[in-house]
Amino acid sequence: MPTATLARLASDYLRQGQRLVARLDDAAYASPLPALSRSSVGAHLRHVMEHFTSLLDGAPTGIVDYDLRARDALLENNRSAAITALHSIERALAQDSMRRDCELLVLVDSGECGMRTRSRSSLQRELQFCIAHTVHHY
């Protein structure tokens, strides 16, 4: 699938998140739920948004590091902040630079051994990852 199509698809999924947030009250957004392994809708949505933000921040430099997420509690507890962030991510995905494939280097924490692995990737592949990750968390 072309990179531009993936960017549009990612925006479609983020708009689904916006619609969900708009339908929830503050307590429903931020409260832990047994069905979400004692996590909240807000925590899952923050996690999704921060993966997209990592990609958007790293793409211009050619280096993406998903482990450097901000883990911003405001996004998981404040619906207004989440909606603002979702709109911002959607606008960034619409930029021309996010519609043309390019090579990326993705840094990954390899786990217990403390090593960081560098993997060659592309904007197209990382958009696919972020979309699949979003579907998983929705």
Where do the language-model regions lie?
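Charge-rich alpha-helical segments
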Residues: 7-14, 24, 38, 83, ...
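Terminal, compositionally biased segments
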Residues: 1-4, 8, 12, 19, ...
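Residue-level recognition of alpha-helical structural elements
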Residues: 3-6, 33, 37, 75-78, ...
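Short, contiguous alpha-helical
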Residues: 30-68, 114-138
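Alpha-helical bundle segments that constitute or directly flank the non-heme di-iron/ferroxidase center
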Residues: 1-26, 42-60
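Amphipathic alpha-helix face/heptad-repeat signature
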Residues: 6-13, 41, 78-85, 130-133
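Short, helix-capping/interhelical loops that line the mouth of catalytic, cofactor-
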Residues: 2-4, 50-95, 99-116
